Regions:
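Short, low-complexity N-terminal leaders and the immediately following helix N-cap/first helix
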Residues: 1-75, 328-355, 416-419
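Short, glycine/charged-enriched hinge/interface segments at domain edges or termini
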Residues: 2-5, 9-11, 17, 61-232, ...
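Helix-rich terminal scaffold detector
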Residues: 3-11, 175-303, 307-313
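Generic structural signal for well-ordered, non-membrane alpha-helical segments
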Residues: 7, 11-15, 28, 32, ...
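Flexible glycine/proline-rich
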Residues: 28-33, 42, 88, 148, ...
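Solvent-exposed alpha-helices and their adjacent loops that cap or buttress functional pockets
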Residues: 54-56, 71-74, 92-96, 109-111, ...
Length: 419
């Protein structure tokens, strides 16, 4: 077998090559309760003002501000309560001279009133109360349209539908939502050394951990996943299963077979399915031999057989492809700064991605490498919630240095932030 020439390219260029391809999924309509994590296919425009009416943000009394002028500790002013309303109710009374309506949070301001006095700002009697300070016009009132006005774009095309977006959609009565269909993913683990999870271990064999991991990563994104039987190192059967996967799925992910060994057939498979190879080497560790190809609007990802390298390849390259296919506004991995809490002394000729544990505190983010960090390591992945990105050409980093991290999980907040 002829060894294919590989020229490494930077990580950013690799991602750019992926998202430069013309690949998009169609728009579909889904029920609101099924829309979480989908990408909006159109702008959502406010069809009415929010709030729809002047309302009280507090429990208290609605008054005319003019009647409160001159109030002080030495000159308490008295008001008579003429009505009592809760949220969802509207008073039919007109608030007059030194009159007030007892009002609950969210209720519409009654006619004639233009300020709200909170309960704790009053001394209440049976049908009256007194105040000791003046109130200005519109004080303690949420005004009609102060949050959004009719015609405002409240959610943008390409935005991910999160729980907050679902609240907005529900507010405007969207029982159904137009979204971009999420791509389906085929997962094919390759390697004659692989055993299924329930197989008895044999000498020279390992269980297939990459397949279940990639399936979980894809399902976490809300993608439909097709799991294929573990493939032996055989070119003909490899070509056949990839062709079958391409017929049924929008993305095909293989793990293993991307290196330069005697049984690494992925380049031949890509030739057989007439796929254009976008790149076959990236200037990074782990996962330098990650290979990505493109054919008929579909992506083919050849991820490393090493678990850590496989995980890194999915986070860096598969995720942006999925977002691109769905028309997301943001496709590149989001990077934040963190303080390294332990030395990492290994030299980095290429950009290195380290599995790590990040903690977000009120003082900023800190990060600690997550145990054993070789590309074949498995256990470190389970204890990591981010990847530290160390630039190439460095000779290691000391504790206290500021580094870039990519969060891969959402459990980085310290308990103190919740107290």
């Amino acid at each position: 077998m002829v060894v294919e020439k590989r020229n490494p390219i930077p990580v950013k260029e690799a991602i750019q090559r992926i998202v430069n391809q013309q690949s998009s999924m169609p728009a579909i309509t889904v029920a609101l309760e099924k829309s979480l994590n989908h990408i909006l296919a159109e702008d959502i425009v406010a069809t009415y003002d929010i709030p729809r009416f002047d309302k009280s943000p507090y429990d208290g009394f609605a008054i005319r501000s003019v009647d409160s002028q001159g109030a002080s500790g030495q000159n308490r002013i008295e008001f008579k309560v003429i009505d009592h309303i809760g949220a969802g109710s509207v008073s039919d009374k007109l608030v007059g001279d030194h009159e007030a309506v007892r009002i609950m949070t969210g209720a519409q301001i009654p006619n004639g009133a233009d300020a709200v006095v909170m309960f704790e700002q009053t001394i209440e009697l049976e049908d009256t109360f007194t105040i000791r300070k003046p109130f200005s016009k519109n004080e303690n009132i949420s005004l009609k349209g102060e949050e959004t006005k009719t015609g405002d774009v409240v959610l943008k095309k390409g935005q991910v539908i999160n729980p907050g977006a679902i609240a907005v959609l529900a507010t405007y009565g969207y029982a159904e939502v137009k979204v971009i269909k999420q791509p389906s993913v085929a997962v094919i683990a390759t390697g004659s050394e692989l055993l299924d999870v329930n197989d008895v271990l044999e000498d020279g064999k390992i269980r297939n951990s990459n397949g279940p991991m990639i399936c979980a990563l894809a399902e976490k994104l809300g993608l439909e996943v097709g799991i294929y039987k573990t493939q032996k190192d055989d070119l003909d059967s490899g070509i056949q299963v990839v062709k079958e996967a391409m017929e049924k799925h929008d993305i095909v992910i293989t793990t293993g077979g991307v290196s330069v060994g005697d049984f690494d057939y992925l380049p031949e498979i890509y030739k057989a399915v007439k796929a254009e190879v976008l790149f076959n080497k990236v200037a990074m560790r782990p996962g330098s031999v990650t290979t990505v190809a493109f054919a008929d609007g579909k992506y083919l990802f050849g991820l490393s057989g090493n678990p850590s390298a496989c995980f890194t390849g999915f986070e860096l390259f598969v995720k942006p492809a999925v977002k691109h296919m769905c028309g997301a506004l943001e496709v590149f991995p989001q990077i934040i700064k963190a303080t390294l809490m332990e030395d990492f002394t290994k030299a980095n000729p290429f950009t290195r991605f380290i599995r790590a544990k990040a903690t977000l505190t009120s003082a900023g983010a800190t990060v600690v490498p997550s145990g054993f960090n070789k590309s074949g390591a498995v256990v470190a992945i389970a204890h990591a919630n981010c990847m530290v990105m160390l630039p190439g050409g460095s000779r290691g980093f000391k504790a206290g240095h500021t580094v870039d991290i990519i969060l891969t999980e959402s459990d980085a907040a310290e308990e103190e932030l919740l107290l």
